[in-house]
């Protein structure tokens, strides 16, 4: 048996990828261990009570902060490692990668973010006091900032899910946090913009960053790949991720809100907004569905969360409970319409393959929330009696220029997302020379994971079931409206990544393989 040069090149480059991945990951981990040891430390003075009697020591205010902090830490921890991971398991042959990559990259980014956050805080301190600290305090806020940055990276990952190698994800996980904290440094530390739950810094920035990278990685074969489709079990697991994100989102938006009424409002407004977006999702999905007014699980998994995103900037502000529900309802409506009408046009006109639909879940709701924060700031400045004196000083840190500060921070978030995405996109294109996925490896675990015997092999069964379900609804003469006149014999990716097989005379064009054929296919495909 002979091998051509292309096969030899593919085998050679395939061996390079794990070497580069493991070496870079190992070196970067050693680098962070050294930096943590040399640059960070715990504050040992905050627990001092003035008493020399150890029996009187109970932790004081610090213990109260720890008790309050741990609940938020736990909830956000679940969101990042469980919620985002399982939300991406909808792809029928990509479950290992969705969970595994979110796991390792989130763990890495959580470490890297502590160092970057300490550096930019030290930079901000030097600008104000003229002295750059030699060591950085490792605090509870440091852990939260690590989670927030991990969330932004996971949002970006959603746009390129299925089309990247572990090395690609590692490079993006190293570079994106630099732009994330540069954005926070400009908007939070200098402009003092309002963004309690990361509507701008996490959702808007992360989604623009990911969509820009996706523009570089989108090609014709990725758009036509039939494995870019969900499975029944995958959708159920993804729905579990949605439910955990939905339940924990109030903690995400309230974690760093000022204590007292602002923190309570952040919890309440986020919850109410989530209920509004959930109701809107079921209404709009059922009303405008292209498949017989049936609910689409893609909408339920994603658009129901839009209420949490739209509250990211202003959850702690006095916006009225009815206003919170209305914002969630509007965000959910626009999100579903985005999946139905905007995403197909973006893919066709702009050539951006957005695997998870982050444009509709994070980008548009995040932008709406950022604009809402500008108007809420104007209203608050014109009606200062809406807040107590202490609340007003905590929320409107930029004073009379708060609205303009938020407008500038919104534009900066979009701009840095584009610039950072362009840089990473160019780098990932070059990395394809080391090991780029072949078209047959898109949206599959087989290239990088040891797989069990029941790993799904063919898409024909899913096509057949979809045809059987839709044929009942179109039996009354709706075939012309549903596009039966399309070219025969082609497997087409329908809207929302659903697989649609054109029909002819109520028979399937693609014959389902026999058990023996499936077994032969399994043996022939390299894992």
Curated annotation (Swiss-Prot):
It is a multi-pass membrane protein. GO terms for biological process: ammonium homeostasis; ammonium transmembrane transport. Residues 483-495 have a biased composition (Basic and acidic residues). GO terms for molecular function: ammonium channel activity. InterPro entries: Ammonium/urea_transptr, NH4_transpt_AmtB-like_dom, RhesusRHD. Residues 514-527 have a biased composition (Acidic residues). Residues 1-18, 92-99, 163-166, 217-236, 285-299, 343-357, 428-527 are cytoplasmic. Disruption phenotype: Does not appear to exhibit a phenotype related to osmoregulation perhaps due to functional redundancy with rhgB. Glycans are attached at residue 47. GO terms for cellular component: contractile vacuole; endosome; membrane; plasma membrane. The chain crosses the membrane at residues 19-39, 71-91, 100-120, 142-162, 167-187, 196-216, 237-257, 264-284, 300-319, 322-342, 358-378, 407-427. Residues 471-527 are annotated as: Disordered. The keyword Transport applies. Residues 40-70, 121-141, 188-195, 258-263, 320-321, 379-406 are extracellular. Keywords: Glycoprotein, Membrane, Transmembrane, Transmembrane helix, Transport, Vacuole. It is found in: Contractile vacuole; Membrane. It comes from the Eukaryota. May be a carbon dioxide/bicarbonate transporter. Interacts with ap1g1. Belongs to the ammonium transporter (TC 2.A.49) family. Rh subfamily. Acidic motifs (DDEEE) in the C-terminal domain are necessary and sufficient for efficient transport to the contractile vacuole. This is Rhesus-like glycoprotein A. The gene is rhgA.
């Amino acid at each position: 048996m002979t091998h051509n040069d292309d096969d030899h090149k593919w085998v050679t480059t395939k061996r390079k990828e794990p070497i580069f991945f493991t070496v870079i990951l190992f070196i970067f981990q050693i680098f962070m261990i050294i930096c943590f040891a040399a640059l960070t430390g715990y504050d040992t003075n905050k627990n001092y009570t003035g008493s020399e009697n150890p029996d009187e020591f109970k932790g004081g205010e610090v213990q109260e902060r720890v008790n309050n902090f741990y609940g938020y830490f736990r909830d956000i921890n679940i969101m990042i490692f469980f919620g985002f991971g399982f939300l991406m398991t909808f792809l029928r042959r990509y479950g290992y990668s969705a969970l595994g990559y979110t796991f390792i990259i989130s763990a890495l980014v959580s470490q890297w973010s502590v160092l970057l956050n300490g550096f930019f805080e030290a930079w901000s301190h030097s600008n104000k006091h003229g002295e750059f600290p030699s060591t950085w305090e490792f605090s509870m806020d440091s852990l939260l900032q690590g989670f927030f940055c991990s969330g932004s990276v996971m949002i970006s990952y959603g746009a390129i899910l299925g089309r990247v190698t572990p090395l690609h994800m590692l490079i993006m996980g190293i570079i994106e946090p630099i732009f994330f904290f540069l954005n926070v440094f400009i908007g939070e530390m200098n402009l003092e913009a309002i963004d309690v739950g990361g509507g701008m810094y996490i959702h808007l920035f992360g989604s623009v960053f990911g969509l820009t990278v996706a523009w570089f990685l989108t090609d014709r074969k990725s758009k036509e790949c039939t494995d870019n489709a969900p499975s029944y079990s995958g959708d159920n697991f993804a729905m579990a991720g949605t439910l955990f994100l939905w339940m924990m989102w109030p903690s995400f938006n309230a974690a760093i809100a000022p204590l007292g009424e602002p923190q309570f409002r952040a919890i309440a407004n986020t919850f109410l907004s989530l209920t509004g977006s959930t109701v809107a999702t079921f209404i709009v999905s059922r009303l405008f569905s292209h498949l017989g007014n049936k609910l689409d699980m893609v909408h339920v998994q994603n658009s129901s969360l839009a209420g949490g995103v739209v509250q990211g900037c202003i959850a702690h502000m006095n916006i009225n409970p009815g206003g919170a529900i209305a914002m969630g309802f509007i965000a959910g409506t626009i999100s579903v319409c985005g999946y139905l009408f905007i995403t197909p046009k973006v893919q066709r006109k702009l050539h951006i393959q957005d695997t998870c639909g982050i444009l509709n879940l994070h980008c548009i709701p995040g932008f709406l929330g950022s604009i809402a924060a500008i108007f809420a700031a104007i209203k608050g400045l014109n009606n200062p009696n809406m807040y107590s004196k202490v609340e007003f000083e905590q929320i409107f840190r930029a004073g009379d220029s708060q609205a303009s500060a938020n407008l500038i921070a919104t534009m900066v978030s979009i701009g840095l997302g584009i610039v950072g995405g362009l840089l990473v996109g160019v780098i990932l294109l070059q990395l394809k020379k080391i090991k780029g996925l072949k078209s047959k490896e898109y949206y599959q675990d087989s290239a990088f994971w040891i797989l069990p015997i029941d790993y799904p092999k063919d898409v024909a069964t899913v096509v057949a079931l979809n045809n059987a379900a839709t044929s009942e609804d179109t039996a009354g003469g709706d075939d012309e409206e549903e596009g039966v006149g399309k070219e025969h014999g082609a497997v087409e990716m329908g809207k929302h990544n659903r697989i649609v097989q054109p029909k002819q005379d109520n028979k399937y064009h693609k014959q389902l393989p026999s058990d023996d054929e499936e077994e032969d296919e399994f043996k022939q495909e390299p894992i």
